């Protein structure tokens, strides 16, 4: 099953810089939010990353800032991860700024949950506690009554994501916080206006949400490159099916727990895995040697 939105038919919305936005899969926002390239044909080449993997390389050059961007998307055999590498370069003799946010388009359901561990959330000039605001858990889609977004402040881990129990699907994004600090979600809301906006984009019967990862903590900040400077970052998307809300995730595993049980799902093939579960006192509660397969 698709974990990202794929509307049918595709109906561009007039909310982009050039007046055309589609809620489809992943959007690489550069050099600003909902970038000018979304509905434009882009230079694209296939390349061989080695070891049986397949790769696509996309290049975007911004005429205003002069910053050159390359996005590499890689799929590797024996795993269910989508790898992306971003390379930003400033070839000009002056300092220039840009933003980068990876934007995943998601079909929204009432119980869909934003999986994030943060101290606070930020919206324009307003800071709120997180995850509870006025007694409501704002991570859960049904509690976002109108169009709104939230940026995680002081996120505590290298991963975040989402999961929908209604669709039994979700995903986590994994990247080093030293490279990518931003963790954000946006919802059109589940009121009449929000559902109407989703229908206009070809998503019928559900709402629409976005889960975004950025270089900086909010979209009010720009990263700057000195003359000849460059910036490289790596990120991974890990799809989840029939799993639940994630408690922890890496590029190898995702973990969820409920009273009396732990569940583990793998992103890669493991022929002979030696696993141990320990308690808070360090005592080993259970050990097992098993084979794991993606999913």
Summary of predicted features, one role per range:
Residues 2-9, 80, 91-230:
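A contiguous, surface-exposed recognition patch within enzymatic or periplasmic domains that forms
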Residues 26-80, 195-221, 227:
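Extended, loop-rich substrate-binding clefts of extracytoplasmic carbohydrate-active enzymes
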Residues 239-250:
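Short, Lys/Arg- and Gly-enriched loop/turn segments at beta-strand edges
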């Amino acid at each position: 099953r698709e974990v990202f939105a794929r509307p049918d038919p595709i109906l561009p919305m007039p909310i982009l810089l050039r007046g055309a936005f589609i809620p489809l899969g992943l959007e690489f926002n550069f050099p600003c939010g909902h970038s000018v390239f979304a509905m434009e044909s882009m230079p694209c080449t296939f390349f061989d990353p080695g070891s049986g993997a397949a790769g696509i390389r996309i290049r975007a050059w911004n005429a205003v800032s002069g910053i050159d961007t390359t996005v590499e998307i890689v799929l590797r055999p024996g795993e269910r991860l989508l790898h992306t590498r971003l390379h930003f370069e400033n070839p000009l003799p002056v300092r220039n700024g840009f933003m980068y946010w990876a934007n995943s388009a998601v079909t929204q359901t009432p119980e869909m949950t934003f999986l994030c561990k943060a101290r606070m959330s930020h919206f324009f000039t307003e800071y709120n506690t997180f995850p509870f605001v006025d007694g409501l858990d704002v991570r859960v889609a049904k509690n976002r009554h109108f169009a709104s977004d939230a940026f995680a402040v002081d996120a505590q881990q290298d991963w975040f994501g989402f999961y929908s129990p209604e669709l039994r699907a979700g995903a986590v994004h994994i990247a080093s916080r030293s490279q990518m600090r931003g963790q954000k979600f946006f919802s059109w809301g589940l009121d009449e206006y929000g559902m109407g906006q989703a229908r206009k984009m070809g998503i019928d019967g559900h709402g629409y949400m976005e889960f975004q990862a950025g270089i900086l903590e909010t979209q009010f900040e720009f990263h700057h490159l000195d003359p000849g400077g460059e910036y490289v970052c790596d990120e991974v998307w890990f799809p989840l099916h029939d799993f639940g809300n994630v408690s922890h995730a890496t590029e190898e595993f995702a973990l969820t727990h409920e009273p009396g049980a732990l569940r583990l799902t793998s992103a890669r093939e493991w022929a002979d895995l030696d696993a141990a579960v320990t308690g808070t006192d360090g005592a080993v509660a259970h050990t097992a040697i098993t084979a794991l397969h993606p999913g």
